[in-house]
Each structure stands twice: as structure tokens, then as C-alpha cells.
Amino acid sequence: MAMLASKSPFPAPLATSGSGMMAGTAQASYPPSRRAPAVPPASQSFSPTESEFSDSDDHDSPKHWDEDKVCEYLRSVRCGEYEKLFRKNHINGENLLEMDKDVLKEMGIEKVGDRVRLFLSIKKLRTKAIAGQKKRNRDSFAGHESMYTPVSESPSKPFHSSSRVMPNPSVNKRYSRQIDLSGMAYDPSRPTTSSRPTSPLPSADFRTARTRNPYVGQQPTPTGSLRGLGSPPDSQANSRPVLTHTRTDSGMDGSLMAALPQNQDVIRVISTGGVTKVVKIADCNTCEEVMRVTLRKFALREDHERNYCFWVLSGLDPDPKQCRRLGDTELWRVIKDQKRPERNRLILRRVPAGEPGQSELERAAAIAMEEAQQSHSRAMDNVGARSQIKVQKVLGENWDNLQPPLSPVLYQDRERNVYNAARDLERPEPLDSGRLQPRRKVLRSFGGLRPPSELIASDLTTYFPDHPREDIDRTARLSMRRSARLSKVNSRLSVASSFSMASSIQDAPPIPTIADSWLQSTPLPKARPRDLQSRLQHGYRDSVASSMLDTLQEEGSPIEPNRKSYVSFADSGSDSAAVSVTDPDGNIVRHSYFDEGSTIGSGSGSGSFGDVSKALNEDGEDADEDLQSFLSGESWDDSKWMKGALIGQGSFGCVYLALHAITGELLAVKQVEAPSPGANSQNDARKKSMIEALKREISLLRDLRHPNIVQYLGCGSSAEYLNIFLEYVPGGSVQTMLNSYGALPEPLVRSFVRQILNGLSYLHEREIIHRDIKGANILVDNKGTIKISDFGISKKIEATNLLNGANNNKHRPSLQGSVFWMAPEVVKQTSYTRKADIWSLGCLVVEMMTGTHPFPDCTQLQAIFKIGGGKATPTIPEDASTEAKAFLAQTFEMDHNKRPSADDLMLSPFLTPIT
């Protein structure tokens, strides 16, 4: 019999009763009251569906893309840098849809992040293409099935066949529904065939079509023959097209996870974000050893096994209520019993984090659903013939038509993509769509923390996605050129100077601008070798130039080292963005572009901003208006800096990475949305309060200069935002470290506490109370330097408050800060002194030693009553050293007058080992 090709076009309307010999014969064979359907000649065959199971795809389908279209797609997913690589390998749309991570790696895409992003984009593209073809399949099938109507008005009961024949392989590895119109004529030699479609989506469509028209897809009669159009009217079998299903293995089966290997001691563990790994536990004899092996597999600290636990999902839905934590006894039973399905989807969680997140639950549910599908398939394949007959009698349906359950992952992913695409297409375009801001890209972390400046400088386009590569490259290039130019100018000025650079810094009057002048730096010892010099002075900010420029070599003969000094940027091995200035005595002092309170030279000496600006005009090079504007203090309008990825956000606003367009210095900009003019809504009142808090923070920070306090650089405003520019601190907060690594070891706590006390001592000397010392507000850079941040609720001590004390109701202290870190006098609102920060410091030490806040068993309201009652103090960790317990006992003194100051605590034995 003639089977039709999958690409044959579907003919126009079928021939009339008078067109075609077969049709005429059929008409003559029946009484006038009945007439057979008009059928084209048997030599013409076609596919009625034109679905994803045939090769007749839409021309716009990704399968038909050429190399130019593929390159355009790469640019749309921010992978345009690999355009040449794809062209070199002649990748077209058909090749693109078949690519996976291994293929991308073999092509030469070295970055893991780019491979993952590109693979996920290709996967979504593949899913979208299949979903579109699936819709065309349904529409086409519904449009064509009406052409195959039954001969009789009353349908006959279908006969069932218990035979099961393996599906025939197809050449193009697709499903294909094909119709053999010659089968409508009587053919006694035609064999009895039946097939069981095992593809979830096609079979679902077929079942829907068969429900709408019971004559489509019925099985042949038990005699193995079909009565043709010439059969008598009382024929039991009606003429209909015969559908033949073919199937081979598909490369897009949607499988999520393979089953664990049999007879091997392994478990599958799901971690944060739905990441799964298979862990070998053959050599583990206790649950603690299992936990340590698991932590090692996920690159976590093994000595923190007590901070982690295992959870398991009981049902098939990602519902936290169906999730339970496993104790050691139950965990051991699960991992040792290879018949337990839970060992294939254990969830690893930190104990303080509580129940698993949504991503972990979804991954566990998907694995459980796939296990259920595989179990169903195995059960169906192992059923005997007698059992099949019983099932057919009970269900009233042919065994071969019983469909396996849909693949949950495949179905959910595809339906979700189809729904999202349809929703995006049907959504009306808003009137102010031109003003909508694109969704901000979150700063890509580095080991769970903020990336160092070297990493940002090596891939600026990733961290500044809203700016063209040309603008970013020009900024980096100009910043290096300007740094070299300033080095030459300051070198000439220092040679002409008759006094030491260090002394001029102290005598320099401040310039009344936001970025007034250079910061007065502590002179370092004599010049050291380059490898040692790079380790000094980590308390300066990062810049693109500091990561790209090598240190300029000192000019002049070694015989006359006092003849010259030079200015250069730190080498790439340091995070310093400061300018290194060597004075005639050989001392090195470093400055940054935005440091205030000092100048390079006094008003009449060399090195002041005025002298530098004058020297730039006389150095014979082209005028640089942007640099002159920067030297005059005009540094913070929107054209002078570039907004990068999102670092963090909170109730106050958002913090973004920023790049100064003149100097190439990396910054952090805190943005608060400005209230609408004349608006009095509750939201605008909240914005005004945040603006006031930000202004209060600016007024305090602009006068602070300390290596353990986040450096304020300047501020600016626009019609929509108020911006405050701070130094960029790579790394993260203490709270982030605790979330990532658990409790900190005591030697590290000692180091952090000493630096925090240095910063608090500096603040308290200037009558400033921070009022919110906690792990989230203490930053740790990638060199281990502490930075105290977030001065939004800090304030200066008023003399009237100190004199009148708690009896001054007009200036009654407000309840400011975080409840778990509050001192008793703050909760009672009796007084607010420097000693409140000391209590909060003790709570911070407990937080670092335990990994949780000081009152983990209390809600905020319960903690307020506990602390305000004056009888409860945070529990001191039992495993703390004697010195640490004594230190905490001093900080938790209930009477704030007896509580030691920051300077007194610096002499504590707890901090002695690191002095």
C-alpha cells in the first residue's frame, strides 16, 4: 500500500461524488439514502495534522534559521561575543536546537556562567518551538477530521484487539500520523496492526481527537480485515482512515533525573536553588559522616555539620506542609534502604533556615513525579495478557489505548512557556511604555559574596549591562590615560616643591566641594619591593585603573633617590584605587580621587587642585574638560557616573554598583526615590522620611574618615532620585557570611571585634552613636577588613540630653534599631548613650559565634519584653573561651553606667592574642 510522505501538501477540498472512479463506484454500490464520503485517489496521500511529528514546520521556526538569524538570537540573549565562534562552526537553527552544555564546552565557550545561560536559552527556545507546533497540530487535526465522516449515522461498537505490536522506527526520529487512503478499500491481505503511543503529548492529542470523533483511530476487526466502500450496508465495520503511529527515541524527552544506580550506596541531595548532586556514602558509618561527605560535595565547610539537616518531601506537590525534617534514626533507615524512594530526593538545609524554599520543593516534587511515571511504565509493561483482558472489561477501553501519565516536567515546562508567551503577546501596550525602566540585573555574586574589583574590571559589560560596550571601554581607556597624565603632572610639581609632601597634606586648607580634595593618609614606611607593597593599605577603594594599570616604575637613578617623587596607581594585586605618592624622603602616601580633608600641597605649594588644574593646561596635551570639571568638584551629575547591577535593596531604597565616568573608580550608589511634588499620600510621606534619613546619613558620613567605616564620597540628585555615593566594598556583610558558612571560629571573631571597636571608638570620640550595630550592617571586604555601614538612624549626642537625662521628656529617646540587638535602656526608652552600641556589639559577637541572632527562640515582641524586663541577657555560647565569656559579660552589663567603653574593651584579654 502506498504510504504518503510527511511533507506532502494537504490537498484542497476533497473531490465530489462524481470526481474519481472510486467515488463513482462507491456511489453505485449504495442505496440513495446512503452515500459514501468522497475520497481522492489512493495515489494521493497526506498528513492531516502537519504537527511537530512531521517535517512540515513553520518557516519562522528556529529549525529553519540560518547563521545570521542564529547570531541575532545570540545577541538577544547577551551572548554576542560568541558570534564569530558560531559562524566558524556554521551553526544554523537545526544545530542550535540540538546543542547541550557539553557541545557548548567543546566549541570553546570556557565561562561556565555563559554556558549555563546559553543552554537555558536554547532549552526555552526548543520548548517554545515544540509548543507552537503542538498548537498547529491541534488546529490542523480539528479542521481535517470532519472530512472522514462515518457511512452510517449510528456508530457501531468498536472491536478490540489484544495484540500488541512494537512501533515501527521512523527515519527522522519523530512521531508521524499518516493516513493510507487505500485502506478505505477492501483488502483481505491487510494485517491486523495496533500501536500504543507512548509519547505523552501526541497521545493526549490523539485521545482528544478520538473522543470528538469515535470513528477516527478505531482498531481493525478481529478478522484482520476492513470492509471497503463496496461492502453491504449492514457491515459491522465502518470505513475510516487508519492511523499508524511510529516512534523512535527522541532527544527531547524532558527527563529530569535518572534513577539512582542499583546496589550502590549513593543518595541524591538537593541544595539551595534546586542544585542536585549524587553523593557516595559507602564509607559512612554515622549520620554525621554522611553530612560531612554531603557538605564536601557542595563545597561547604565540613566542620559545620551540626548547622545542617536533611528534609524530605512526602507528596508529589511542592507544598511545605508535606515536607518534614529527618531525624538521625529515620535518615539512616532511608539512606540504607535502597527501596526507599526518598533517598533520591533528600533536601539539604541549614538548621536556622527552616523548611526548604520553593525551588528546592519544586525540584523534589519533579523527581517524585518522574519516579511515579517510571513506576507506572514498568508496571504496564509487566502486565500479562489475562490481566490486560480484565482491565479492558473493567474500563471498557482497549489496553493499547491506555495512556501512560504525562511527563510532569515536560508538560509543566512547556505549558508554562506557552502560557507566558500568550500572556505577553495578548497584554496591551501601556501608554507610558516608553518610560518603563527595564528590570535591573542583580549583581552576580562571587562565592556568594560581592565580586572583587579585578573580576569586575575583567568583565565590565556583565556588571554594567545597560551601557554599550563602547562607552565602558572608552571610560576604562580614558581613566588609565588620565591617571598617567596626573602622574606626570604631580611628578613635576613635587620636583619643583621645596617641602615634604606629608607636611603639606596636614597644612592644606579644605576645599568646600563634595569631593573637596585628597584624603590625609597615614604615611607608610620606606618604599618596599613591589610584592610587599601590594599587601599594604587595603582600606582604599577599587577602580578600573587600579585593576588594569601596573605600577609606574620610579624615574631617576638609584644614586639620587631624593630628586624625584611620582604618582601611580596600585598594581593589580591590590584592591587599592589610591594614588601612590613618594615624597623626597622616600615615604609613600596614598590618596584617592574622592578623599576629602587634604590636598597635594597647600594653596601656594605644588600639588593642590588649583596647581594641578593649571599644570594640566600647560602640559602641552589636549584639554580635558571632563577632568577639569572633576577637579573643580563637579563630579556627581548623571553624566559623570554609570549605573550598574543591583547590589541590594531594602525599605530605604536600592544600592547599585556604579562606575565614575571620569576616574574609572568603582562606587556603590544608594538611591532613594524622591516624592512627587505636591503629593501628600502615605507613600510620599514614607519617601520623605527616607529622604530625611538619607540626609542625616550624609551629614554624619561626610566628616568621617576611618579605615573601618564605609567612606562617603558625595551625593547628587535628579528629578526622580536622591543619590548617595559610597565606596564599593567587595565581599559582603557578616550576616551574609553566616548564612553561607555558618558560625565563625573564635579567632576570626576576635579579629572582627577588634576592628569594630576601632571604628566605634572613632565614632564615640565624635559624639556619634550608631544605634544599629548588627551583622547586616558590618561589611567585610575580600581582604578581611571590617567596614561599619548604614548610618541611617545614627545621631549625634545632644548636650541637653546628657545634662537632663531621662527626666527630659521633650527629648525622650526614640525606639530605634533592631529589636534583638537593642540595649535594655533603649527598650525602656530611658536613655541613649554610647554604651548602647557596646551592648549591641556583644549581641553581634553572640551572632557570629552561633550563626543566629541573640534571642533565636523569641519573636520580636517577646524579645522586647524580655530585654525591657531587665532580667534577661543573651545566652553566652557554652563553647566560647574563658576570655570570650568575660568579654561578653562586660558588654551585657545591665547598668549602662557600669558598661565599659570601646577604648576599655580594646584592653580586654579577649583581644590580646591578636595584638
From Swiss-Prot:
Annotated binding of ATP, by residue: I647, G648, Q649, G650, S651, F652, G653, C654, V655, K670
Protein name: Mitogen-activated protein kinase kinae kinase MST11
GO biological process: positive regulation of developmental process
Phenotype of null mutants: Produces much less aerial hyphae and conidia and shows weakened cell walls and higher sensitivity to cell wall-degrading enzymes. Impairs the formation of appressoria and the ability to infect rice plants.
Listed EC numbers: 2.7.11.24
Keywords, in A-Z order: ATP-binding, Kinase, Nucleotide-binding, Transferase, Virulence
Domain notes: The N-terminal sterile alpha motif (SAM) domain, but not the Ras-associating (RA) domain, is essential for the function.
Compositional bias (Low complexity): 26-45, 152-163, 188-203
Disordered: region residues: 1-65, 134-171, 183-249
UniProt family annotation: Belongs to the protein kinase superfamily. STE Ser/Thr protein kinase family. MAP kinase kinase kinase subfamily.
UniProt xrefs under Gene3D superfamilies: Phosphatidylinositol 3-kinase Catalytic Subunit, Chain A, domain 1, Transcription Factor, Ets-1, Transferase(Phosphotransferase) domain 1
TM stretches of this protein: none
Alphabetized InterPro entries for the sequence: Kinase-like_dom_sf (IPR011009), MAP_kinase_kinase_kinase (IPR050538), Prot_kinase_dom (IPR000719), Protein_kinase_ATP_BS (IPR017441), RA_dom (IPR000159), Ras-bd_By2 (IPR029458), SAM (IPR001660), SAM/pointed_sf (IPR013761)
GO MF terms held by the record: ATP binding; MAP kinase activity
Residue intervals of the SAM domain: 65-128
Species this chain originates from: Pyricularia oryzae (strain 70-15 / ATCC MYA-4617 / FGSC 8958)
Subunit: Interacts with the adapter protein MST50.
PROSITE patterns: PROTEIN_KINASE_ATP, PROTEIN_KINASE_DOM, PROTEIN_KINASE_ST, RA, SAM_DOMAIN
Highest taxon of source: Eukaryota
Catalyzed reactions per annotation: L-seryl-[protein] + ATP = O-phospho-L-seryl-[protein] + ADP + H(+); L-threonyl-[protein] + ATP = O-phospho-L-threonyl-[protein] + ADP + H(+)
Residue ranges constituting the Protein kinase domain according to the UniProt record: 641-911
Record function comment: Mitogen-activated protein kinase kinase kinase; part of the MST11-MST7-PMK1 MAP kinase (MAPK) cascade that is essential for appressorium formation, penetration and invasive growth. The MST11-MST7-PMK1 MAP kinase cascade transduces signals from the cell surface sensors MDB2 and SHO1 that recognize various surface signals such as surface hydrophobicity, cutin monomers, and rice leaf waxes. MST11 acts as the upstream MAPKKK that directly phosphorylates MAPKK MST7. MST11 but not MST7 may also be involved in the OSM1 MAPK pathway in response to osmotic stresses.
Record-annotated Ras-associating domain positions: 263-353
